[in-house]
């Protein structure tokens, strides 16, 4: 039998159910924070942990950012999922606001928010998301203000679309290793390739794109 929950816990559950019914996946920690009126996302994490202990949500202990929401029939308007995300185990993927040389990409101070993605898409990789600025990759289907999903890795193969750090500035381009230099190729005929001989760091490989309609 579940323990009695307080008003804030109920608000979180109601918001989770509302967003799952509307979108098919749970909201981000930041969205929960704003909806319930908390000042800090750490408070949300604390409440989510209490709900997990009460059996109302599930977290995979081997995957710290994985979250599985348990269907709460008392608060849900329907028992039927609206789309394929419902009932799937999800991973809260960090959205990176700033990339800084010499600092780990997933440093807490770099994370602006999180976004839930299906675990079977992310698998066991370490992934993060970035918002694209500019139109240099439009011919590859990556547009201004899109969110790219990036698998963190420090190497790349020719033809991979990567996030690279050059002189403290992140760029999204197609990677090519040439004789004596690296060519970062844009996917827009109006842009020239970037030729790099040193001071280049590969932050990851782009594995997906999300766009707000």
Swiss-Prot record:
Active-site residues, as the UniProt record annotates them: 136, 173
MF annotations from Gene Ontology: DNA binding; serine-type endopeptidase activity
Superkingdom of origin organism: Bacteria
A Pfam family of this chain: Peptidase_S24
InterPro entries cross-referenced by the UniProt entry: ArsR-like_HTH, LexA, LexA-like, LexA/Signal_pep-like_sf, LexA_DNA-bd_dom, LexA_repressor, Peptidase_S24_LexA, Peptidase_S24_S26A/B/C
Annotated site residues (Cleavage) in this chain: 101-102
Key words of the record: Autocatalytic cleavage, DNA damage, DNA repair, DNA replication, DNA-binding, Hydrolase, Repressor, SOS response, Transcription, Transcription regulation
Entry EC number(s): 3.4.21.88
Gene Ontology biological process terms in this record: DNA repair; DNA replication; negative regulation of DNA-templated transcription; proteolysis; SOS response
Residue ranges of DNA binding: 29-49
Keyword Flavoprotein: no
Reaction(s) this enzyme catalyzes, per UniProt: Hydrolysis of Ala-|-Gly bond in repressor LexA
Free-text function comment from the UniProt entry: Represses a number of genes involved in the response to DNA damage (SOS response), including recA and lexA. In the presence of single-stranded DNA, RecA interacts with LexA causing an autocatalytic cleavage which disrupts the DNA-binding part of LexA, leading to derepression of the SOS regulon and eventually DNA repair.
Family under the similarity heading: Belongs to the peptidase S24 family.
Assembly information from the UniProt record: Homodimer.
Protein name (Swiss-Prot/TrEMBL): LexA repressor
Gene encoding the protein: lexA
């Amino acid at each position: 039998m579940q323990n009695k929950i307080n008003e804030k816990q109920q608000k979180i559950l109601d918001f989770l159910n509302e967003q799952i019914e509307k979108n098919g996946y749970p909201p981000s920690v930041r969205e929960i924070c704003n909806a319930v009126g908390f000042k800090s996302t750490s408070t949300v994490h604390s409440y989510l942990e209490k709900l997990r202990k009460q059996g109302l949500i599930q977290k995979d202990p081997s995957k710290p950012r994985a979250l599985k929401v348990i269907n709460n029939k008392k608060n849900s308007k329907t028992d039927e999922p609206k789309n394929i995300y419902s009932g799937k185990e999800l991973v809260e993927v960090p959205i990176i606001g700033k990339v800084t040389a010499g600092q780990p990409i997933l440093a807490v101070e770099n994370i602006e928010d999180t976004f839930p993605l299906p675990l079977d898409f992310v698998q066991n990789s370490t992934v993060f998301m970035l918002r694209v600025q500019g139109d240099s990759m439009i011919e590859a289907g990556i547009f201004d203000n899109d969110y790219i999903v990036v698998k963190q890795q420090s190497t790349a193969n020719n033809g991979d679309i990567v996030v690279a750090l050059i002189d403290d500035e992140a760029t999204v381009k197609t990677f090519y290793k040439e004789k004596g230099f690296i060519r970062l190729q844009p996917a827009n005929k109006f842009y020239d390739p970037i030729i790099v001989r040193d001071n280049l760091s590969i932050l990851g490989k782009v594995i997906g794109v999300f766009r707000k309609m």
